[in-house]
């Protein structure tokens, strides 16, 4: 039986949004308290990652990202570290993702190939056949490397924007009510800062991949799509 695929919106809600709201709004002494609030917020991505591991046989990237992000934010708040560390943390998350995207090129499972050049989107057997016929297998590898650096660049941009956004918004000492309110504002703004440029560049990379494949295979766009997408388009 095929495992259910991770739902990105549900993952985002459970692993990032709900924990962030708990940290910023319910970790004060009048509600949960600092330590209990931190532990409750952290429990959401942990439980969701365990659920993914049991049901889908994978931990889920967003759940892991949520855990790391909430854990680091909570540590900064609980131990009242200087707010500069929060700016570093907010920049570090997308920066590390971008580095991971590039490093994955040296592994058997490049992330861009897994995300964009896969059988869910494309008819890989037909594409491979045409690439071999046209002697363009090397060219498609070069195309995937270029698209990898495009996507990694989007995360670098997000890291820079996140750093300055955090420095601008969070100015109160950690452990104060003002810090928690500013953290809530940051949460509301920081993920669009990550998501919007990354999504835009992802679409550009996807367009570049599709355009390159049609050129290298000599097939029209409709022919390179997976059977599943062809059925949906009817």
Positions of PLM-derived features:
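Structural signature of hydrophobic alpha-helical transmembrane segments
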Residues: 29-43, 62-63
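Long, highly hydrophobic alpha-helical transmembrane signal-anchor segments
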Residues: 55-103, 174-182
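Membrane-proximal helix-loop-helix units in multi-pass membrane proteins
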Residues: 85-141
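C-terminal ends of transmembrane helices
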Residues: 47-56
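Structural signal for membrane-spanning alpha-helices in multi-pass inner-membrane proteins
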Residues: 19, 23, 52, 73-77, ...
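Lipid-exposed faces of alpha-helical membrane segments in multi-pass integral membrane proteins
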Residues: 10, 14, 18, 40-47, ...
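C-terminal membrane-adjacent module
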Residues: 120-224
